[in-house]
Each structure stands twice: as structure tokens, then as C-alpha cells.
């Protein structure tokens, strides 16, 4: 491609609203342009990268025995009602009506559509197993789109769905896709890690893993063991819990009786630490929640945070929300910040870590007062004991006896789920087994955020000058840059190199613009083509410069050697 004919509007400075490195560089390199919040146009160079991503995914999906389909983005609301997700999904689901007042949704996922397809086409065990996939635009009405393609309202996704006759078949399908994801992300040049995760709104009873691209900008926190292979999203991560009854024990006489202390306007844990000189791990934090509309008190240590996903799972609640100020003050009889476990008339859920403390400080359910010397299970009744907090740095690993948890940030680029019969039972997607009995198909689903992968790659592969594309994703493989468009000899040699490289099967960009050399070189570094061949003053002697973008190295070679070196670099 001749650069003079290419729509490649590079920018010297990124727009001020671009927060992440990938967003800034993708705007500056002319890959994308914003149409509205969370909605982007892919310009020609960005589209080339996207197509290469899609090609890798298609190749690996085909290798894994999957078959490609293409499903509608607009889905009847009735299908979502059949699965039970229409109301549960929440405001992120984009809903609309046609002129006949029929309800539809713009698909964030396609579990309902694919299940509807399969229940109409598959009715025998002889037709199983089968795995179908598509590459399709998805929609999600994000409350706060940000970071460019990392959190958008319209995005590209690969979603696959497996259908098996039994759980053994699902386990095999899941492993096959898990392995395919390893190959895909490795080929994309990502530094990634699969982690245990929560199934979220997609659900299913068989477990799930997220594939996390490690990056400081990531919105997810990963808890990983420093000794074993355990890793989990913070939403899911556990911690080592002592065996047996971990509640504090011992002679009550050894502990002072609870005493009420005056703490005027001291509402937060850090304020309480400062006022009393006690450490946060010797305090209880009491929060009121509504679980399916019913109030519960949740208690964690003062230095810990409630994990609402774990809490909802423990309570088996479809809807969980923090109680508002009016509800909290009505239940406790005190202002916000003074809630405590003693005397509450609602169920009390206590985290394991909070149960193990001998004597603590807690809210008194009286404005401007706290209790000291409170003992969990002695001075208040525990309705339920469980893991309802976020794991923290230094917690014991739940998977091994010696490891400690450490935290890092990650970008979720893919997720695999064992759905089981969640959708097939709800939507009656059944088949006849060898004995003629009707059974629900066993499902799995597997997603990759393609546009998010593109951003994650840029987050990991860049320097101060611009993007450094991995070889399989680079929009072009070679960038031929004559220093002066006015120098006929340089242009002739550059043109011949361009033609020879194209004939050899390489994707080549020729910078034939009449621009200053500095502008050309900055643009070349910015867009990140792996090899740049500079045709300059030494062209008259048959010498050009080969510069390797990812290595930061350069060498002078003859024009005859250039093609051979390019071949060797790309392994062709």
C-alpha cells in the first residue's frame, strides 16, 4: 500500500479524554476514531489489525473442531424471558421496540439465540457433540465507557457454544477450548494468565475461568499464590480458612465485659483507628444489605471489604443491594457509621476472619457510641458463617498449605464457562439418548473480546515512540521509507524494494509522501510496523538501513540482502 493513498491520520498529541496508553496510541496512530461514548470507527489500519486477530481466532477455532455461524444482533425479548435473564441482566442490556410494539434486545451475548437454534435442529445423541462459534458485534450499555476499546458500548466478540450429551463430554469440550485460548493469546503476543472467576450474568453450575492480560490499567484484580498455581479474580478468590470451629474460644472470665465508649462523629474505620489507637484488624465493620428485599447484617473485620458476589452466592440471592441510609438507620436505631451486631433483629452473616478475633471494637447501634471487648458468637448470635470478604495481600492460599496471596491487575480478554443445563432446561433444548430417553443438552460457552484484545496488546507492546506490534498482528510487515520523495534514485530503489517484497508475499507499506524525514520516522515508529527499510543517502551505493521496531536495533545492508533478512525475520 502506498502511504500517500492510505487514510492514516496520525496525531502528534492524543485527545485529552484518552486515559489509557492504548487509547492514546490507537488514536494517535490513526487506528480508531470515536463516534460517541464507547462507540468507535475502525480506520483502515485498525481494521487490518482486527482482521488479523479474527484470522488467528478462526484458525484456532477450526483447529478445535468448531463450526462458524452468524446470528442476529437483534434478539426477541421473549427468548430472554424464557431463560430468565431479561429482568436479571439489568440496565446494561440495550432494549428496544419495533413499530408493532414488540420487544427486542441488542445482544451482549447469544446464549438464548444459540439454544433456540439447537433445540430446533438437534434432537438425537447422534448429532452430538457440536460446537458452534461466531464473530459478531455485541452491545452493552455501559454506565461509564472508558479506556477506548477496553470498555465500550459496542464491541467485537468471538462467542462459541458447545453442546454435549453428558458432563464428560462438556469437560472434554471445555478443555479443548481452554487449550485453544492458550494458543490464541500466545499467538497474539499477550502475557496472560487464566484465573478462576465468577460466572456473573451468564451463569452456569460447572465453573468458569477468565483469561487475564496482565496490565496496570486492568480493571480486574487477580489474586495469585506465590507458591502454587492458584489464581483467581478477586470476585472469586478465596483464602485459607482454618479447619473446624474457628470462632474465638476460651474462658469468658479471661475477657473483660463489653463496655460502651463515647465516639462522637467517629463514623469510619480509619477515624476510629485514629481516635482509639486500636488497629483495624481488631474492629468489626457492620453493613446492612437487602437480599431479595430482606435485610441482613454482614460483618467483616475492619481492615477487610465485603465481597457482594460471594455474599449473594452464600445467601442464594438473585438481587443484593446495600441498604440505603433510611433503611439502615431504621434497623439499627443509629446514624450511619455506628451500626453493630449486638441487639440487631435481622440475620447476622459473619466472615470467617471476623469470627476468629478474640475481642473487638464494634458499633453500638447508638449514635456516637461504640462497644469495646465484643466477642463474636458470645455477645451476639451468628446466623451464618462464611467467606464474604475480598481476599487480601498476604492471606493464606486456599489451595496449598504454605503459599501467600499477592495481587496484580489484569484486563479480561476471554472467559470460558461450563453452563451445564442452565439454558437447555429453561428453554427445553432436549435430545433423545441411545435408550430413547429425553435429556437436556449439556452446554458450555466461550467468549473472546476481540476489540479488547487489540487494546490489551497495545497496553503490553509499546514504548515512548508508539506501538510495537507482535509479528502476527502488525498491520503491515515491512515499512519502506525513502528519506526524500524528491530524490529520484531513492524513490526508484524504494519502489523496487516495495515491488520485490510484495511479490515475495509480504505486506508492505511504502511511504511515498513528500514529508520531512523526521515526520516519516515518527509516523513509522507510532504505527509500529516490525521492520523499517530506510532508503537514504547511501542508496547510490546500494545500501539501505534495516530497523527492527521490536528490538530497537538497526543495521546497514545491501538492497540484495534486505529481502533475505526480511524472510529470515519472519521465518519464511
Predicted features, each with a name:
Residues 1-572:
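NTP/phosphate- and nucleic-acid-binding module
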Amino acid at each position: 500500500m502506498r502511504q500517500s493513498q492510505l487514510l492514516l491520520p496520525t496525531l502528534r498529541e492524543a485527545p485529552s479524554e484518552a486515559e489509557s496508553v492504548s487509547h492514546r496510541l490507537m488514536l494517535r496512530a490513526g487506528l480508531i476514531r470515536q463516534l460517541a461514548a464507547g462507540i468507535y470507527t475502525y480506520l483502515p489500519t485498525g481494521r487490518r489489525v482486527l482482521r488479523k486477530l479474527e484470522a488467528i481466532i478462526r484458525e484456532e477455532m477450526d483447529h478445535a473442531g468448531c463450526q462458524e455461524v452468524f446470528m442476529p444482533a437483534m434478539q426477541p425479548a421473549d427468548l430472554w424471558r424464557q431463560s430468565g435473564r431479561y429482568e436479571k441482566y439489568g440496565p446494561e442490556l440495550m432494549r428496544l421496540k419495533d413499530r408493532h410494539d414488540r420487544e427486542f434486545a441488542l445482544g451482549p451475548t447469544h446464549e438464548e439465540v444459540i439454544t433456540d437454534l439447537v433445540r430446533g435442529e438437534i434432537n438425537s445423541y447422534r448429532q452430538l457433540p457440536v460446537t458452534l462459534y461466531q464473530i459478531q458485534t455485541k452491545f452493552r450499555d455501559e454506565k461509564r465507557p472508558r479506556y477506548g476499546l477496553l470498555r465500550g458500548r459496542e464491541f467485537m466478540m468471538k462467542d462459541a457454544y458447545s453442546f454435549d450429551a453428558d458432563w464428560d463430554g462438556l469437560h472434554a469440550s471445555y478443555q479443548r477450548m481452554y487449550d485453544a485460548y492458550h494458543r490464541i493469546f500466545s499467538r497474539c503476543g499477550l502475557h496472560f494468565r487464566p484465573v478462576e472467576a465468577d460466572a456473573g450474568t451468564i451463569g452456569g453450575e460447572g465453573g468458569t475461568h477468565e483469561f487475564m492480560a496482565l496490565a496496570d490499567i486492568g480493571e480486574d484484580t487477580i489474586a495469585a499464590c506465590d507458591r502454587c498455581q492458584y489464581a483467581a479474580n478477586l470476585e472469586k478468590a478465596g483464602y485459607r480458612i482454618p479447619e473446624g470451629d474457628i470462632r474465638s474460644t476460651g474462658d469468658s472470665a479471661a475477657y473483660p465485659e463489653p463496655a460502651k465508649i463515647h465516639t462522637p462523629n467517629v463514623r469510619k474505620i480509619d477515624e476510629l483507628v485514629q481516635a482509639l489507637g486500636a488497629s483495624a484488624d481488631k474492629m468489626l465493620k457492620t453493613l446492612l444489605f437487602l437480599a431479595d428485599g430482606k435485610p441482613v447484617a454482614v460483618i467483616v473485620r475492619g481492615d477487610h471489604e465485603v465481597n457482594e458476589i460471594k455474599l449473594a452466592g452464600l445467601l442464594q440471592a438473585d438481587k443484593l443491594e446495600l441498604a440505603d441510609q433510611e433503611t439502615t438507620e431504621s434497623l439499627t436505631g443509629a446514624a450511619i457509621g455506628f451500626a453493630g451486631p449486638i441487639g440487631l433483629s435481622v440475620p447476622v452473616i459473619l466472615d470467617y476472619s471476623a469470627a476468629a478475633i478474640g475481642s473487638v471494637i464494634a458499633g453500638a447501634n447508638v449514635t456516637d457510641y461504640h462497644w469495646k471487648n465484643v466477642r463474636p458468637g458470645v455477645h451476639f448470635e451468628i446466623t451464618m458463617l462464611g467467606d464474604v470478604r475480598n481476599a487480601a495481600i498476604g492471606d493464606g492460599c486456599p489451595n496449598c498449605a504454605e503459599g501467600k496471596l499477592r495481587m496484580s491487575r489484569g484486563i479480561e480478554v476471554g472467559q470460558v464457562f461450563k453452563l451445564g443445563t442452565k439454558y437447555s432446561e429453561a428453554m427445553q433444548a432436549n435430545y433423545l439418548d441411545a435408550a430413547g430417553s429425553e435429556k437436556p443438552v449439556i452446554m458450555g460457552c466461550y467468549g473472546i473480546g476481540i476489540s479488547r484484545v487489540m487494546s490489551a496488546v497495545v497496553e503490553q507492546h509499546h514504548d515512548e515512540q508508539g506501538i510495537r506490534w507482535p509479528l502476527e498482528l502488525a498491520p503491515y510487515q515491512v515499512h519502506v521509507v525513502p528519506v526524500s520523495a524528491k530524490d529520484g534514485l531513492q524513490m526508484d530503489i524504494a519502489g523496487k524494494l516495495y515491488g520485490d517484497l510484495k511479490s515475495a508475499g509480504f505486506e508492505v507499506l511504502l511511504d511515498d509522501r513528500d514529508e520531512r524525514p523526521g515526520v516519516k520516522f515518527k509516523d513509522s515508529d507510532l504505527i509500529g510496523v516490525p521492520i523499517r527499510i530506510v532508503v537514504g543517502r547511501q542508496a547510490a551505493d546500494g545500501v539501505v538501513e534495516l530497523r527492527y521496531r521490536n528490538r530497537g536495533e538497526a543495521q546497514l545492508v545491501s538492497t540484495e540482502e534486505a529481502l533475505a533478512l526480511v524472510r529470515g525475520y519472519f521465518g519464511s
